[in-house]
């Protein structure tokens, strides 16, 4: 089959797949360390989804009041509902201030205080004094376009350090032999050629799989391509049942309104004009963690206190803030609300609804980015030749629920740590192990089979069935009945993938084929998500079970590992959460009842 395709071979020290914040920070970090580095991306780097991150990036700088990285760690552990690994959380929070200063030195145009310091705003779940003090102003912001500012800066650094980019290349599958990764195969959308990239290390920075749902803040490119490749390689994914619903997606459009809007003083109201969050989170109110706010909004709507003709959303008020503050600190969402909701935020409230936003689960890694698996009694056995970072990975610093502004921090901290580890492991220009012909042949055969699929179902129709099923059956609130139905429905939809029809057989800019390959990735991750959720019989973080409303620390402080066997059956396993810290700089944080 390989003879039927124009295959171009490359050899690099490292290949990064994905050019968002994590991928770019990793790529130029590796190039800076002297490694011959390639970066494969299916879209132009500055169109990666990091560009849509609005509110900011967290670090205990203390510019707007006293702060400490230990308080940041406490908030992150609590936010994770004690499913986050405390060694990785310590590493992230301790390294956060240096990561911000590094970004500033690279040229990120952060907003400033009157005395020239980096401006920091309050964000949900961020406190002082280990949760006993006032709200922390910890989120460093570049107005409400922080991701845009960071992504462009990291791309400039990547060009400076001569990362070799392969832009508009679609990653098809990993080259796996003897339980280790030897490279990746990609398809050049512009000329139709296939490329075999040999590498001592492949770094997956491919983002989340938000597009498995019908309504999501994610770009249409967020199809979890890294997770799909990992599942097909026979490796597990971790904690896939934990899907974050952001409280404030614009009603009907799904576009994000940053949590920074509430950080600047915005508040939610129901049909009675009541600030209902005061009932659900008396201390934090509208700045409780995202899972808490999304559940509160859903309850208000269910109980008939929603707004609008169908009483199916709530209002976010910013119109009490001065136009000068809105213009200076929230210019992007003012524009977004005007375009997608027809609202002038200086005069009227924004209609909002909880919307799928982030995947806490992903490819299991350690805090140095290395992919790990459970091997007998060793729960953290390293898979050679492969790393994962960013939303594609599950380190796990976010556990069952991510705090807002910890995601951009995750990207730059673990992007950097993966680069340092790769430099430690790889000698530049060292020879590659030989690759068996069958390894490449297997990947080409799968690609060819999808390309020439001539069944009866259009990719768009099957994708819509998956998205609607996930939206209705694996949502903010869950029950065994709904989840079991969801398992059956997603399994059936996945089985029907073999009956898809590809009308366009060409290799140049074939969007039909791209979407078919993306759907394959989405379906596998949708299936392990719903199966993992059906098995976890407790409520923790973003996984809220109406039939199991309480957190069960005795049985469920453990990570879910999910894989798909050759017969298409989901296999679930579990491993302990790391409840010990990395160093003696802070004591472990024991589980307590999580209230805001």
From Swiss-Prot:
Disulfide bonds: none annotated. It catalyses: a quinone + succinate = fumarate + a quinol. Substrate binds at residues 246, 258, 357, 402. GO terms for cellular component: plasma membrane. Its EC number is 1.3.5.1. Its cofactor is FAD. GO terms for molecular function: electron transfer activity; flavin adenine dinucleotide binding; succinate dehydrogenase (quinone) activity. It is found in: Cell inner membrane. GO terms for biological process: electron transport chain; tricarboxylic acid cycle. It is an enzyme of class 1 (oxidoreductase). Coiled coil: none annotated. Pfam families: FAD_binding_2, Succ_DH_flav_C. Part of an enzyme complex containing four subunits: a flavoprotein, an iron-sulfur, cytochrome b-556, and a hydrophobic anchor protein. PANTHER family: SUCCINATE DEHYDROGENASE 2 FLAVOPROTEIN SUBUNIT, SUCCINATE DEHYDROGENASE [UBIQUINONE] FLAVOPROTEIN SUBUNIT, MITOCHONDRIAL. This is Succinate dehydrogenase flavoprotein subunit.
């Amino acid at each position: 089959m390989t003879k039927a395709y124009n295959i171009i071979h490359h050899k690099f020290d490292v290949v990064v797949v994905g050019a968002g914040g994590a991928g770019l920070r990793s790529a130029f970090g590796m190039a800076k360390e002297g490694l011959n580095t390639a970066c494969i991306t299916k879209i132009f780097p500055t169109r990666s989804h990091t560009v849509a991150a609005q509110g900011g990036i967290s670090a205990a700088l203390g510019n707007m009041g006293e702060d400490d990285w230990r308080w940041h760690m406490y908030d992150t552990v609590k936010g994770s509902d004690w499913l986050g690994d405390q060694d990785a959380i310590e590493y992230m929070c301790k390294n956060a201030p240096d990561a911000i200063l590094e970004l500033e030195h690279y040229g990120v145009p952060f907003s400033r205080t009157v005395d020239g310091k980096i401006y920091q705003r309050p964000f949900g779940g961020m406190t002082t004094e280990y949760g006993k003090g006032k709200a922390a102003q910890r989120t460093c912001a570049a107005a409400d376009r922080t991701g845009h500012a960071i992504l462009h800066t990291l791309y400039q650094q990547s060009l400076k350090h001569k990362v070799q980019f392969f832009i508009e290349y679609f990653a098809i599958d990993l080259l796996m032999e003897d339980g280790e990764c030897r490279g990746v195969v990609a398809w050049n959308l512009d000329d139709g050629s296939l490329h075999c990239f040999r590498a001592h290390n492949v770094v997956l920075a491919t983002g989340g799989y938000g597009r498995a749902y019908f309504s999501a803040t994610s770009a249409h490119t967020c199809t979890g391509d890294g997770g799909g490749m990992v599942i097909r390689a026979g490796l597990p994914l971790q904690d896939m049942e934990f899907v974050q619903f952001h409280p404030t997606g614009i009603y009907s459009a799904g576009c994000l309104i940053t949590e920074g809007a509430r950080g600047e003083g915005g508040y939610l109201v129901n049909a009675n004009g009541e600030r209902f969050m005061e009932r659900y989170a008396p201390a934090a109110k509208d700045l409780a963690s995202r899972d808490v706010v999304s559940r509160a909004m859903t309850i208000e709507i269910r109980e008939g206190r929603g707004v609008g003709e169908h009483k199916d959303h709530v209002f976010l008020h910013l119109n009490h803030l001065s136009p000068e503050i809105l213009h200076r600190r929230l210019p992007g969402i003012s524009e977004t609300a005007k375009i997608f909701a027809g609202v002038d935020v200086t005069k009227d409230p924004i209609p909002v609804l909880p919307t799928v936003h982030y995947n806490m689960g992903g490819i299991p890694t350690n805090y140095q980015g290395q992919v790990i698996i459970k091997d007998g009694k060793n729960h953290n056995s390293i898979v050679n030749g492969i790393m994962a970072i960013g939303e594609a990975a599950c380190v796990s610093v976010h556990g069952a629920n991510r705090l807002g502004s910890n995601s951009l921090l995750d990207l730059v901290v673990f992007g950097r740590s993966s680069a340092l580890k790769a430099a430690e492991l790889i000698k530049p220009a060292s020879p590659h192990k030989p690759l068996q012909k069958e390894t490449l042949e297997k990947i080409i055969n799968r690609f060819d089979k999808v390309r020439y699929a001539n069944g009866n179902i259009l990719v768009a129709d099957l994708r819509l069935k998956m998205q609607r099923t996930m939206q209705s059956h694996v949502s903010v609130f869950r029950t065994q009945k709904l989840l079991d139905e969801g398992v059956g429905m997603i399994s059936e939809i996945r089985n029907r993938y073999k009956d898809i029809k590809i009308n366009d057989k060409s290799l140049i800019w074939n969007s039909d084929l791209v979407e078919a390959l993306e759907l394959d990735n989405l379906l596998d991750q949708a299936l392990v998500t719903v199966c993992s959720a059906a098995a976890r019989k407790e409520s923790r973080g973003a996984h809220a079970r109406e039939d199991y409303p309480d957190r069960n620390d005795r049985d469920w402080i453990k990570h879910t590992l999910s894989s798909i066997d050759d017969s298409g059956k989901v296999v679930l396993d579990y491993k302990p959460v790391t409840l010990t810290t990395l160093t003696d700089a802070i004591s472990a944080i024991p589980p307590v009842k999580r209230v805001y």
